[in-house]
Amino acid sequence: MPAYLLAFDDAQSVEQNLVTRVLDESAALAREPEFLLHAELRDLVPYHSVLMALAQGKSSPAQLAKSTGIDVRGLNYHLNTLVELGYVQRRYPVSEAEPSTRSVRYALDDSLLRFWFRFVFPHQSVLRLLGPERGFAEVVRPELDAYFGRCFERLCRESLPLLYLGEGIRAPFIVGEYWGADVQVDVVGVRQDNWTDLGECKWGDVSSLPALAAELDEKVRRYPNARNATIGRRLFMRKSPAKAGPRLPGLRVHTLQDLYGLETGA
């Protein structure tokens, strides 16, 4: 568990913790990211630009260069430094094929930095003017659901090894996501028992399970399966649909509550 989570109060809601522990200027976590970066880096301006672009969802070198205005050589230097410090993760699409270096993407690997550079750093003057509670209501809350959606995808990928453990799967595996010219898969698990799991994540309300399953089926058809592995299909969702539809054979469905149960051992 990251040390900063110890500052959160389990008796408070997520909103209350963010207001009192992160957005309040007097809180310990309010300046923690700045202290961390000042201790590790010099000339923070370009690093701030890169981290803010990553927090906004930019991930490819081309996107990051365009967003930050930093030339390729300088961008690579700053990204490599952030990767070495453990703040940023270098990622490649997961499949049976050897990934090309041109397919690399980057993501903020630290949850506090990801939130801080998404909501706090770009809006510091506004948040200071509004105060923590009103700042949350006007700056954070309108974008929070979309932000949680991306966090949910990450949680699903991190939960797949625990699902394998509970299902008695002992074959070696790698877990990640896949992106290509015409398909993006949220969760991929490539196992050495000639099995590959492909998963779709849905944070918003699911009105039709068959429709979501059909979207996943289309991604299964487009996913490069060079070794002709058996494909397992998984749907990850915040909660089950209000109306239970027909049982879909060959499909595993996991809700947020299921994933919490894995983490807590419940």
Residue ranges: model-predicted function:
Residues 119, 186, 209-210, 245-247:
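Short, well-ordered secondary-structure micro-motifs
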